[in-house]
Every structure is written in C-alpha cells, then in structure tokens.
Design a protein with these regions (language model features):
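Extended two-metal-dependent nuclease catalytic cores across DNA- and RNA-processing enzymes
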Residues: 1-173
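Low-complexity, acidic/Ser/Thr- and charged residue-rich accessory regions of DNA metabolism proteins
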Residues: 152-153, 157, 162-221
C-alpha cells in the first residue's frame, strides 16, 4: 500500500493519465472508459490490454476487444464466445457460477466452466435457468446435481454476479482527447529517477512531452 503513491507519481511522470478511484475498482474505470470510447464516433477501435476474465464482458463485436499480452492473442466477441462458451453479456453470470480466485468469490459447487457455458449459452442469464432440470432445454451431465446446487444457492450466486459485473459509471473527468499520450514529463520524471537512483530509465524514454513555452509560436511575457 505504501508504494501506491509512488506508483501514481511514476505513471503520471511518464505522461499517462492516472485515475485515482474511491468506491470503484480499477476495472470499473477501464470498463467506463471503454464504454465511453465505444460511443465516440472518432474512435476506430478500443483495445483493453488485460488478461482478466471479467474484462471480457466489455467486449463489443470487433470494436471493443481484449488483448492478452502474455498469450499475444486478441479476443473480439467471437473470440470471447470461443474461449468461454458464452457471449460477453453472460460473462458475469458465468463467473458467478464458476468463481474467480482473482476477485475472491468461489462460485457454486459442482459447476465448472463447461457446464456453466453449456447452460448459459442457451439461457444467457441466471434468472432464466429453470429450477427443475427436467425443464432445461440443454443436455448437461449431472444436471440434477447442478440444478440442486443452483436452486439452493440462488442468493449467493446473484451476489457473486454483482461482484463480477463491472460498473461503467466511474467518475472519469477526462475526455478521449485528454487521454492521448504526448510523452513523458521531463521536469517531473528526471527528479523522480534521481530520487529513486534509477537514472538509467531516462535513456529508455523515446518521447518527451512538449511544454507550452517550447511550442512553435508560443511567447513568454
């Protein structure tokens, strides 16, 4: 926790917009920014650079996609469906059933990735899944046991879904143009690197932001 302020200083010095969050998670900020950019006609495509499963719910067609930098793979809507077996809109329901260790909720017993995908591919959301497995329109192995677990755990699985759903109303003040990277801030980054004894990092900066006084045609008075 003590390193968070330092991390914010370092990121800001690199010229990257920082979004401090209160009552929101970092993923909520990313989801909010992606949703806003999706509505902006000047934005050609939104790429979310995260391998986190919950970010898949933000994917929209081929316009809003996810990049797994470790596996070097892009996921559009078809890719999400291929990977998880459900549409992006069903990802929170899928995570609620399966669980997500990264976010600290266990999912429901007996439910696995394949069974959750098979059921949600048809019903899409938890509320639409009948309590009686005889009424299920899909054939799933162990349906009776799965239905019993779901029936007895409706309240908790709805809570898990609430935790899995990303918010798109985070208070981000910046507009899309404000987010454009213009280079690192030399006046801030150089003293910070000196303070940390990491001056070698300065050699890796390939673009410095132009301060107003250095812009062509600018005047000081």
């Amino acid at each position: 926790m003590a390193q968070f302020p330092l991390a914010e200083r370092a990121v800001a010095a690199l010229g990257i917009v920082v979004w401090p969050m209160i009552e929101f998670e970092a993923d909520d900020a990313i989801a909010t920014a992606a949703a806003r950019a999706d509505l902006d006609p000047d934005v050609e495509q939104v790429v979310i650079c995260s391998p986190d499963k919950d970010m898949a719910q933000c994917v929209r067609g081929t316009r809003v996609i996810c990049l797994d930098r470790v596996r070097k793979k892009l996921y559009d809507e078809a890719g999400v469906r291929e990977k998880f077996g459900v549409l992006p809109s069903s990802i929170p329901d899928w995570l609620a059933l399966v669980g997500d260790d990264a976010d600290g909720y266990p999912g429901l017993a007996r439910w696995g990735a394949k069974s959750a995908a098979a059921v949600l591919a048809h019903y899409e959301h938890l509320e639409a899944i009948p309590d009686n497995p005889a009424q299920w329109a899909v054939a799933v192995r162990g349906a009776a046991a799965l239905a019993e677990t779901l029936r007895n755990g409706r309240d908790e699985v709805i809570l898990y879904r609430t935790l899995a759903r990303l918010r798109t109303d985070a208070p981000l003040a910046e507009s899309i143009p404000d987010l454009e990277w213009r280079g690192a801030d030399r006046e801030v980054l150089e003293p910070l690197c000196n303070e940390l004894g990491a001056t070698g990092l300065l050699e890796r900066v390939h673009q410095w932001a132009v301060v107003e006084s250095e812009r062509p045609g600018s005047s000081q008075g």
